[in-house]
Amino acid sequence: DAHTTEVEPKTSAPIIDVQPAQREILEKHMYGGTMRLGAYAAILKEKTQVLKLYQETGRLKEDEKRINELMKDKSQAFRLGILERGKKTVLERHRHRYEVNPRFVDLLEKNGMVFSGYYERFDKTKLMEYIELPNHPFLISTQSHPEFKSRLGNPSPLFYGFIKACGR
């Protein structure tokens, strides 16, 4: 019965849903400001496929420079959220209203999924950015749009990983 409220608004298991703070705004048909749009930071978990791909492609170092630039601009603090010192962090672009429902994160992890990256809002809500199935050759999903930063000579770490897995 798991579903997204974007497709099935009355699902009893809304795995993907709008955040509670957005619901009231959307019910009034006021869509401005309800979308996560542009670059946002994601803290990556150690010993995950996602972290390994970002390390292999050099994107961690590349994104570290941009994160340091954003830290100097107080008006962009919302893009970084709460960062944890010493944690590996990347920036990816977004364009969506729906998020993994925090109520289901523990259940999904208990059943084998790994949330390998997250963004932490200033209210301490963690928004899941990456999910993977560790023992699968390549089952990785993201909230971001890696195609926005992918180039032929510098592919997205996730696209790089997918092609690499296809070649095995």
For each feature predicted by the language model, list its residue ranges.
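Amide-donor transfer/coupling interface in amidating biosynthetic enzymes
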Residues: 1-168
